[in-house]
């Protein structure tokens, strides 16, 4: 069996981890990932190394029983333990999560996004189409079920464990990139009820009730996330995350206090993982 079989087995690993049409089973997911790696599928081999916190050279890749050895080194109980969550602000509700992603996971996600990012888009409130707009000048890459992996699935699971926001409510995650001068000007993440372009999305997919941003690197300057109505901004360390509710806790209505911006980067290149969460289970895409 070759790469084709390995790719199919790796897809089964993702489905097992995410609980698609079955209960989530991370032990089975790791076992399937090992099988995929043994079939020669490089992405599965890389994911095992990331989950085990190992660096592989040519000699290591040639070793007998390497992939099972790596799997035994994965601290699955630790990875499936909720990361610490600390409240940073009450209105709007903002929390900081320590170590949502490991350093190896951050590097993997940057590499995964680097070859795929394209100009970021915003939703047009009149048409519902996603369009390029000067309000957002960075780049983004989305990863639906067809091209997600166990590293992305683990960030979603760890967010669920910390916050109670179920994996199946989470949209496809996006890796974001901002180079010098690029920014995301003041905006809201919620969908405005009654707007013709958004109402169908609200009716079918629900409101975007929460946003989680995970910092993937720190070799840049500027680029803080600023909440303009409360005069508060934040920038996390690699692997740390910020979770905020886009709706009021009292009545679940859109919260105008969440007006926020990604400030311009002044040196280097900023990488983030963005995760939006809806108020209901999402279609499988």
List each model region and its residues:
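A conserved position within tetratricopeptide repeats
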Residues: 1-2, 37
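Fe(II)/2-oxoglutarate oxygenase catalytic core
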Residues: 11-18, 24-243, 247-285
């Amino acid at each position: 069996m070759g790469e084709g079989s390995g790719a199919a087995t790796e897809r089964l690993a993702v489905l097992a981890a995410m609980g698609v049409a079955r209960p989530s089973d991370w032990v089975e997911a790791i076992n399937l990932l090992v099988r995929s790696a043994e079939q020669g599928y490089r992405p599965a081999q890389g994911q095992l190394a990331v989950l085990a916190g190992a660096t592989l050279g040519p000699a290591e890749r040639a070793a007998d029983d390497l992939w099972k050895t790596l799997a035994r080194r994965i601290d699955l109980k630790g990875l499936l333990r909720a990361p610490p969550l600390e409240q940073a602000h009450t209105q709007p509700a903002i929390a900081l999560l320590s170590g949502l992603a490991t350093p190896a996971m951050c590097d993997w996600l940057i590499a995964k996004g680097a070859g795929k990012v394209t100009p970021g888009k915003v939703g047009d409130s009149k048409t519902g189409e996603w369009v390029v707009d000067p309000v957002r000048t960075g780049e983004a890459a989305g990863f639906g079920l067809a091209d997600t992996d166990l590293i992305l699935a683990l960030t979603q699971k760890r967010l669920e464990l910390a916050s109670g926001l179920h994996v199946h409510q989470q949209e496809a995650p996006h890796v974001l990139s901002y180079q010098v001068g690029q920014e995301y000007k003041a905006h809201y993440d919620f969908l405005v009820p009654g707007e013709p372009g958004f109402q169908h999305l609200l009716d079918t997919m629900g409101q975007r009730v929460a946003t989680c941003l995970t910092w993937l690197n720190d070799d840049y300057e500027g680029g803080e996330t600023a909440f303009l109505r409360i005069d508060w901004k934040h920038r996390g360390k690699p692997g740390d995350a910020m979770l905020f509710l886009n709706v009021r806790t009292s009545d679940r209505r859109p919260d105008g206090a969440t007006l926020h911006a990604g400030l311009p980067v002044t040196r280097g290149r900023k990488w983030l993982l963005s995760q939006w969460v809806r108020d209901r289970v999402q279609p499988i895409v």
